[in-house]
Curated annotation (Swiss-Prot):
Keywords: Chaperone, Cytoplasm, Stress response. Transmembrane segments: none annotated. Pfam families: GrpE (PF01025). This is Protein GrpE. SUPFAM superfamilies: Coiled-coil domain of nucleotide exchange factor GrpE, Head domain of nucleotide exchange factor GrpE. It comes from Clostridium perfringens (strain 13 / Type A). PROSITE patterns: GRPE. Participates actively in the response to hyperosmotic and heat shock by preventing the aggregation of stress-denatured proteins, in association with DnaK and GrpE. It is the nucleotide exchange factor for DnaK and may function as a thermosensor. Unfolded proteins bind initially to DnaJ; upon interaction with the DnaJ-bound protein, DnaK hydrolyzes its bound ATP, resulting in the formation of a stable complex. GrpE releases ADP from DnaK; ATP binding to DnaK triggers the release of the substrate protein, thus completing the reaction cycle.
C-alpha cells in the first residue's frame, strides 16, 4: 500500500521539475539572467557599503576637527585663567604694600604732630617753678595739642544742638529746672570726630 504522504511529496517534486523545464524552455538564458541579477544586487550592496563608509569617515573627520577646536579653546581658557590669576596675585601684593605704606605714612604724620606736645610736657616737668608756672606750661601744651588735632582735621563734637545718639553716649538722665528735654546737661568726656567718622563719642548727661 502506497503512503499518501510520500505520494504527495513525489507529486510536488514532479510538478516543480516540469515547471522548471517549461521556464527554461521558454527562457533558455534564465540561469544567466538570475546570475546577472544576483551580481547587480551584490554590486549595489557594495556601493551602499562604500557610501556608508565614506559618510562615516567624513563624520569622524568632522568630529575630530571639532574635538581639536574645543581642545584648543580649552587650552586658551586655561592660559587666560593662569594669566588672570597671576595678575590678581600681583595686584593683591601691590595693594597690600600700598596699604602698608599709607598706614606707615599716616602714623608718621600723626607722630610728627604729636611729638612737640610731648616735648613741651617734658620741658614743663623739668622746670623748677610755681604751680602757676606749671599751669601755664600745661595750658600751652593743651593749645599745641589742639593745633595738632586741627591739622589732622580732628574736631571736638559739639553738644549745643542737644543730645544725638550718633554723636553722644548718655551716661544718665537728669532733671534740670528750666531746661528743655533731651538736652546735654553736662559733658563727662569730650568726643571727637574726623569728617563724618566719630573717633570717640562724647560721654554726657541728658535732661528729661
Amino acid at each position: 500500500m502506497v503512503d499518501n504522504k510520500d505520494f504527495n511529496e513525489e507529486l510536488k517534486e514532479n510538478i516543480q521539475e516540469e515547471l522548471d523545464n517549461e521556464t527554461k524552455a521558454e527562457n533558455p538564458n534564465i540561469d544567466e539572467e538570475v546570475e546577472e541579477v544576483s551580481e547587480d544586487i551584490k554590486a549595489d550592496e557594495k556601493v551602499i557599503d562604500f557610501e556608508e563608509l565614506q559618510a562615516l569617515k567624513e563624520e569622524n573627520t568632522m568630529f575630530k576637527s571639532k574635538t581639536k577646536k574645543l581642545e584648543n579653546e580649552l587650552e586658551a581658557l586655561k592660559d587666560r585663567l593662569l594669566r588672570i590669576s597671576a595678575e590678581y596675585e600681583n595686584y593683591r601684593k601691590r595693594t597690600d604694600k600700598e596699604k602698608e605704606r599709607i598706614y606707615t605714612d599716616a602714623c608718621e604724620d600723626v607722630l610728627i604732630k604729636m611729638l612737640p606736645v610731648l616735648d613741651n610736657l617734658e620741658r614743663a616737668l623739668a622746670v623748677d617753678g610755681t604751680v602757676e608756672d606749671l599751669k601755664k606750661g600745661v595750658e600751652m601744651t593743651v593749645r599745641q595739642f589742639e593745633d595738632a588735632l586741627e591739622k589732622l582735621q580732628v574736631e571736638e563734637i559739639s553738644t549745643e544742638n542737644g543730645f544725638d545718639p550718633e554723636l553722644h553716649q548718655a551716661m544718665m538722665v537728669v532733671e534740670q529746672e528750666g531746661a528743655e528735654p533731651n538736652q546735654v546737661a553736662q559733658v563727662f568726656q569730650k568726643g571727637y570726630k574726623r569728617g563724618d567718622k566719630v573717633i570717640r563719642h562724647s560721654m554726657v548727661t541728658v535732661t528729661k
